Regions:
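Secondary-structure junction motif
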Residues: 129-149, 213-221, 228-237
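Hydrophobic hinge/microswitch elements
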Residues: 69-74, 78-82, 88, 137-193
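Hydrophobic residues within well-ordered alpha-helices
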Residues: 2, 36, 77-78, 126, ...
Length: 240
């Protein structure tokens, strides 16, 4: 019985928050609460910079981060627990979805691995190596890539923790495939290799009800798009 009324209660709370944000905007007060669904790589490498910029312009807006895996974020968006969320494309989630970045998938292998000296890691070799995987509900990127290549991984270990995978590879327990964003800026004792054939994921931002989003939510969504565009245009200009 309680589960049946929960969506209605969440809907009323969301409408109340949107009304409060709109009233605050009319008064010239940029306040309210924005609930952000996110996964690890974005939470670690993107959101701190995005939040810093957003709070410098809208210091009265409260931001609540909800960290999980792809499945968690889509569930939060569906049931109204999050106002907006980062998703991997393509997504079944309804609403306004904006593609932000194509993020390469890379092989993570022990430094003394027999294939570590190659210029690229052949995806088919995953069949011959102990493979360390995220849980099935979390590992859409690697599983999609392997299925597309017709490769059946020799899954030896599974975990929900991205960084636990890196630590296990470091100890020589197996190999894995992970997004470049997640691996950036780390100094682990592992070898990061491009895949052959190459593979990637696309990170997007979803507003499940963009037409009814409160002003603070809409402004944060715009901040996200601007931040990603400026950050990666600077990187391209630096490397070109």
């Amino acid at each position: 019985e309680g589960e049946r009324v929960l969506p209605a209660i969440r809907g009323m709370l969301n409408s109340k928050e949107q009304l409060e944000q709109t009233a605050a905007a009319i008064r010239g007060l940029d306040c309210g609460t924005v609930r952000i669904g996110t996964f690890t790589s974005v939470a670690v490498h993107w959101l701190p910079g995005m939040i810093k910029r957003f709070q410098s312009e809208y210091p009265k807006v409260e931001l609540k981060l909800m960290n999980g895996d792809y499945h968690d974020v889509e569930q939060w968006l569906s049931d109204g627990s999050s106002d907006l969320g980062f998703v991997a494309l393509p997504t079944k989630q309804r609403g306004r979805v904006t593609a932000l970045l194509e993020d390469r998938l890379l092989a993570v292998v022990p430094v003394d691995h027999r294939l570590a000296s190659l210029p690229r890691f052949p995806i088919k070799e995953v069949e011959n190596e102990p493979f360390i995987s995220l849980l099935e509900t979390s590992d859409h990127d690697a599983r999609r890539t392997l299925e597309a290549a017709g490769v059946k991984p020799n899954i030896r270990y599974t975990t929900k923790d991205d960084y636990a995978i890196i630590a296990m590879v470091e100890q020589g327990l197996g190999v894995s495939i992970m997004p470049e964003l997640l691996l950036s800026g780390r100094s682990d004792n592992v070898r990061i290799m491009e895949l052959t054939p190459p593979a990637s994921r696309t990170i997007g931002l979803c507003l499940p009800d963009a037409d009814r989003a409160g002003p603070a939510t809409a402004r944060f969504a715009q901040c996200v798009s601007d931040w990603v565009r400026e950050r990666y245009s600077r990187i391209q200009n630096t490397t070109s």
